[in-house]
Amino acid sequence: MAQFNFGGVMEEVITDDEFPLQKAREILKDEIVAVLGYGVQGPGQALNMRDNGINVIIGQRENSASWDRAVADGFVPGKTLFPVVEAARQATIIQYLLSDAGQMAVWPQLKECLSEGNTLYFSHGFSIVFHDQTNVIPPQNVDVVLVAPKGSGRTVRSNFLDGSGINSSFAIHQDYSGNAREKTLALGIAIGSGYLFPTTFANEVHSDLTGERGVLMGCLAGVMEAQYTLLRKHGHSPSEAFNETVEELTQSLIRLVAANGMDWMFASCSTTAQRGALDWAPRFRDAVSPVFDELYQKVISGEETKRVLESNSAPDYRQKLEKELAAIKESEMWQTGATVRSLRPENRKK
């Protein structure tokens, strides 16, 4: 593995130069890969593998929107598209990409489909790490592995199509065959990964759940709402409040961070912006650190897992979720956002 310096800490990373696609194809040439779940991660991973010459079939609940989507993407019922259990029975590698609650619900049936030497693949460590709540405990005579793309399912596919690829982490939980690592890396390359970062199932799920609830989604949404509400309270117009809270971040500043780091973003702004941001950043850091401490403890204790499974397993979960998302969409802030997005310069009629 190649060695990279991450802020003074040396880490090993697998590159597609040392593990090229042709090697992945050779390792997987006799395998049947069943992608179970054609919802979030399933489509991108399945389509990328199919385009890379891997023998892929889909397992999905019939008479569902995801089944119809798989058909639209070229998977043929009875040939490359089957009900979940039927697909699992045919496979040598089972990519278990149902939702976390879905994995728990289907597991009693799925475990009966596993044969000695099969590979059980996850893209999230949730079900394995919190097995005391999910009851997902694989038999000892199968490989249990993980490849977790560092992006949404949509990004897995779009980055593959534009040639950039996606970075992923990988882990081996159980190596019955003695070849689990090679198969895992082959699958990582086959789904479109450019770089593969070693991790463990536990580290992946702990960091992932913290990130989603924190900076990546939950914290971001909460902080945006707080600033927008403050500006509106003090008489700023909706468009001004949104532009100074969301639009300038997403359309300008975060791109500078992505390109060259936080210092580059600061250096690219006015001296007034620099001074204020540098002075206030530690105050925000200190204010939110206790919240992050609480969050991480709830993640590693399994409390967040309990909440997720109870909520997402409820029969009215989908209706409640749609109501929550509708409330966000219909709020003044995000209705303003829709208008602001329509007025971006690239949307002007020529």
Predicted features by range, described:
Residues 178-233, 239-257:
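Active-site-proximal catalytic alpha-helix in oxidoreductases
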Residues 1-32, 61, 172-174, 190-199:
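Glycine/serine-rich phosphate-binding loop and adjoining beta1-alpha1 elements at the start
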